[in-house]
Every structure is written in C-alpha cells, then in structure tokens.
C-alpha cells in the first residue's frame, strides 16, 4: 500500500496529468485514452515519462523498477510553472564546424592562403600577363568548363546515383563553384603558365557572381523548392576575391620592383603551403573521426572521386582541341578540376541547419581531398616522365639550331643574296685587273 499511496500522491497535482488521462472510479488508478499514442510509463527516477504504449495501470503490488533507457529519458512531463522533478541533463556538444578548434584552423588556413597568393603573385611576368589579357583564349576555355561542363556533370551524377536532396545539393554546389587556389600551386609545380593560371582564377571568381546563381537556379529545382540563389553568400564571394586579388597584386608589384625579394617570397610561400596542407589533413581527420566518415554513403565517395578527375580530363581535352601550348594545356587542366571548396562550405552552412545537413557537410572536404590527391598524382607523373620528355625535346631543338654542317652552310650561301651576285663578265674583269697589277 505504501507504493500505491506514493503513486497517488505523485499524481495529485492536476498539472502533471495529460489532457487525455482519465481516472477510473472503480479501479482507482489512472488509465490512458485508447486514442492517444502516448501513455504514462514508470520512470527510472523521480517524475513521469511519455512513451508510445496503448495503456497502463497502476497495481497495488510493488513492481520492479525498469532499467534506464534512452527513450525513457528523452521526453519528460513538464508541469506548468516550477516542477519538483528536475529534467534529466543531456549534454549538448556543438557540431565540429562550430568548435573553437575549427575556427582557429580557419584563421590559420586563411593566413597561409594569403602568404601563398603573395608568393604566386611574385611569379607573374607583367609582359606576358598583358598578352593573356589581350587574347583570353585559355581563360574562356576554363570558364566554359567551370560553369558549363562541371555543373552539368554534377547534376547528372546526382541523378545517376539517386542521391537524396541534401547530398544532391552539396554535389551541385561544389560543381558550380569557381576555381580554387590549389590550381595555382599545382600549375607552378608542373611548369605551367602562371600568368594564365592567375588570370583564370580571378576571372572565374568574378564570373561566379553571375554564373553561379544562374547554374544553381537551373539545376537545384529538381530537389528543393527554395531557390539557392537567395542563399548565395555574396560576402563570402567578395572575401574570396579580395583574398586572391590583394596578395597577388602585391606580389606582382614586388616582382616588378624587387626581383631578389620576390624569389625569396616564392620559396617561403611554397614551404608554408606544404606545412599548411599537412596540418590541415591531420586536424580535419582528428575533428571528423571514423564515425562521421563511415556515415557517408559509398555513392558520395564515388562522386567525390570522379568529379575532379572528369574536370581535369575535360580541361586538358578542350585545351588540346584548341591547340594551346603544352604549358597552357596543363594549366587549363588543373584550373578546371580544382574547385573553391571554402565557398561551397560557406553556402552549405547558410542553406541548411546543422542537424539537417549532417554528414553532407563533409562533401566539400572530400572533394578537396580527392582533387588534391589526383592533382598530386598528375604532378608526380609529370616530374617523373614529363620533364624528361621536355628536356629531350629542348635538346633536339638546340641541335637543330646549332647544326653547322657543310650542306647547310652551302645552302645558306646560295640563298644569301643580300649583297648582290657576281656575274661572268665581272669575274673576267676582276681577273684582268689582277693580271695587270
């Protein structure tokens, strides 16, 4: 009877009774309405919990206390005003992208990126830079691949692999972003045209203000009703543009005025970028952990691997079709496949709440990982085989320029008529004059 009296005492306040709970006069115990999916269940501690059950009653016999479960602790009966039964404390952990470690890492990466852009600006030759501005064939080809081929490829991959709404939009956003700064570094490592690379990065970022909303408006309507054009963070685009233009412009000025200082800055920027990449990969793996990586579907991994590879191939193929020089082909190739994943991450933060986006926040990081790995393989192949082929070709060109065989000299003498020719009559006259002397 003690347990029954305690139960009756606990149920006495009317504020603790749900609206659909009635008291049976015969049984003397509360019973839940059969139409409600929620019923009162015994709680492991003080207070009541709501759980899906058809009905429950209180018997005068003592019943054993069930073990605590996660479901019994999630929903509690909250009375009006102050309650004598405290709610169970549930620890709240912020998402990994909202932690102080991630914010500090973003600041570190941003500072290293500015140093890298300063060093890349020191590699620009002002004379060749103007030539690419007057004849922007490479920049137009990169823009065609960047905002024409890659968004269409991302759209088709999302349809082929039947991705859900969040995953499809994450893939589409990454495909519509402008070129990233990784292409500038990789172009430098493969002896590409740095003037063309920087022009392509700047122009694609400027074009993103117009073409990126257009691509999102065209392709995103297949999954969501809210136009992502309204969610485009113009502040993030402007910040990306400033972080690219200002250091590069300063680097060009240093190269123009102080040549030796520019060479030193290039070396420092390359080493700083190498250290930044190592720290970034280690810290990203530490923050994410294997559980979050395992929650990503396998189809998303396939898309993250195939997209940058297709971008590199399309850029190189289009540059070959238009008969660009070999160094420009490599530059267009790397610029097309390298995307600005920082901008994609910023849009995903604004487009979806953290609890809804979940592991799809990882797709830009996966894309950055695989585009860096594939570009690294491209650089490694070039360093192993491409440089040897180029050296052999340069040696052949030098041999042709320094060929001083008798046949070649004879042909040049016969073809050289800049000083006139000597006829037979002039030759007889010269012989007579010499005899007279």
UniProtKB/Swiss-Prot annotation:
Any GO CC annotation of this UniProt entry: cholinergic synapse
Membrane topology classification: Multi-pass membrane protein
MF annotations from Gene Ontology: symporter activity
Residues modified by glycosylation: 6, 20, 181, 195
GO biological process: adult behavior; regulation of neurotransmitter loading into synaptic vesicle; response to xenobiotic stimulus; sodium ion transport
The keyword Translocase appears for this protein: no
InterPro entries noted in UniProt: BilAc:Na_symport/Acr3, Bilac:Na_transpt, Na+/solute_symporter_sf
Ranges of the Extracellular topological domain: 1-103, 162-197, 255-267, 313-360
Keywords of the record: Cell membrane, Glycoprotein, Ion transport, Membrane, Sodium, Sodium transport, Symport, Transmembrane, Transmembrane helix, Transport
Subcellular location: Cell membrane
Biased composition (Polar residues): 22-41
Biased composition regions of type Low complexity, renumbered to the chain: 42-74
This protein's record includes keyword DNA-binding: no
Pfam families, alphabetized: SBF (PF01758)
Taxonomy, superkingdom: Eukaryota
Tissue-specific expression: Highest expression in the brain and significantly above background levels in the eye, prostate, and whole embryo tissue preparations.
Cytoplasmic compartment residues: 125-140, 219-233, 289-291, 382-437
Positions bearing the site annotation: Cleavage: 87-88
Modifications made to the protein after synthesis: Activated following N-terminal proteolytic cleavage by thrombin and/or proteases.
Location of region: Disordered: 15-79
PANTHER family on file: SODIUM-BILE ACID COTRANSPORTER, SODIUM_BILE ACID COTRANSPORTER 4
Family of the protein in this entry: Belongs to the bile acid:sodium symporter (BASS) (TC 2.A.28) family.
Function: Transporter for bile acids.
Protein name: Sodium/bile acid cotransporter 4
Species of the source: Mus musculus
Native organism taxonomy: Eukaryota, Metazoa, Chordata, Craniata, Vertebrata
Gene that specifies this protein: Slc10a4
């Amino acid at each position: 009877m003690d347990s029954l009296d305690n139960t009756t005492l606990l149920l006495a306040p009317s504020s603790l009774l749900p609206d659909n709970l009635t008291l049976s006069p015969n049984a003397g115990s509360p019973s839940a309405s059969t139409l409600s999916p929620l019923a009162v269940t015994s709680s492991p501690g003080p207070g009541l919990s709501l759980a899906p059950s058809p009905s429950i009653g209180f018997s005068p016999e003592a019943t054993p206390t069930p073990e605590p479960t996660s479901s019994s602790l999630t929903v509690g009966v909250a009375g009006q005003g102050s309650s004598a039964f405290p709610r169970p404390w549930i620890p709240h952990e912020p998402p990994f992208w909202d932690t102080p470690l991630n914010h500090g890492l973003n600041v570190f990466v941003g500072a290293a990126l500015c140093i890298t852009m300063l060093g890349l600006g020191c590699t620009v030759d002002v004379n060749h830079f103007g030539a690419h501005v007057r004849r922007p064939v490479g920049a137009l080809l990169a823009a065609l691949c960047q905002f024409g081929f890659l968004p269409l490829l991302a759209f088709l991959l999302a349809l082929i692999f039947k991705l859900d709404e969040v995953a499809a939009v994450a893939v589409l956003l990454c495909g519509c972003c402008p070129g990233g700064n990784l292409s500038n570094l990789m172009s430098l490592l493969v002896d590409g045209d740095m003037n063309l690379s920087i022009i392509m990065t700047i122009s694609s970022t400027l074009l993103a203000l117009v073409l990126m909303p257009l691509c999102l408006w065209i392709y995103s309507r297949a999954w969501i009703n809210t136009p992502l054009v309204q969610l485009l963070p113009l502040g993030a685009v402007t910040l990306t543009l400033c972080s690219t233009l200002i250091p590069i412009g300063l680097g060009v000025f240093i190269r123009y005025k102080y040549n030796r200082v520019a060479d030193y800055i290039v070396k420092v920027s390359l080493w700083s970028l190498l250290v930044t990449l190592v720290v970034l990969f280690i810290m990203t793996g530490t923050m994410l952990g294997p559980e979050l990586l395992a929650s990503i579907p396998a189809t998303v991994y396939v898309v993250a691997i195939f997209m940058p590879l297709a971008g590199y191939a399309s850029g190189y193929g289009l540059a070959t079709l238009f008969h660009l020089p070999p160094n420009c082909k490599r530059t267009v190739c790397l610029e097309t496949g390298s995307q600005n994943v920082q901008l994609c991450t910023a849009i995903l933060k604004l487009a979806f709440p953290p609890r809804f986006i979940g592991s799809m926040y990882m797709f830009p990081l996966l894309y950055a990982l695989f585009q860096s790995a594939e570009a690294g393989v491209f650089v490694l192949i070039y360093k192993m085989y491409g440089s040897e082929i180029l050296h052999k070709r340069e040696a052949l060109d030098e041999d042709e320029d320094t060929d001083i065989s008798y046949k070649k000299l004879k042909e040049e003498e016969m073809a050289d008529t800049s000083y006139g020719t000597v006829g037979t009559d002039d030759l007889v006259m010269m012989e007579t004059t010499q005899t007279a002397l």
